[in-house]
Amino acid sequence: MAKNIPLSTIGVKISYAVETVAGTRPTTGYNIIHGLYSTPDFNAAPNTADATSFDNKEYTTKIALLKEIPDNLEFGARMGQTFVNEWETLVSAYETGIKTSSGALETWFCIDIEGLDKSIYFTGKPIALGIPSMEANSGIDITAYISPTGEPIFSTDPTYANDGE
């Protein structure tokens, strides 16, 4: 019998790449975003609809419908100059890609979990950073937002433009 080996968040990489051909997800050249510490939950339960009929005697019957993705996906980050620079570069890359004269080039985001054979990919629009709340005697955290423009998928791990250093 196969033994399940639980995974951890050690080694998780969150990255992005802009399409070079409209409608084709890049497989190489992903840029790792440093300083992130949390991801949104993509494990959404589907909506349901009542399918109860007069045949039911005690319980209702439901059918599964579509899963709902939040309007904005929230990524927690430890605010630092490297993170801010990388996020600004991401926003600029998105804006350049989406305005390309040869057709809008989507930005793909990747969540790569160490020890898992496939990564999670989705397209989205990164939102420029705002001003985070702060408290005395603490580190500064910020929430970075991405508005999803496509459904998440699992596919093979990418190759990276930067090695994560």
Regions found by a protein language model. Give the residues of each.
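Extracellular/virion structural assembly segments
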Residues: 55-125, 129, 137, 151-165
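Solvent-exposed edge beta-strands and adjacent loop segments
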Residues: 2-79, 123-143
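Extracellular jelly-roll beta-sandwich "head" domains, especially the C-terminal globular C1q domain
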Residues: 144-151
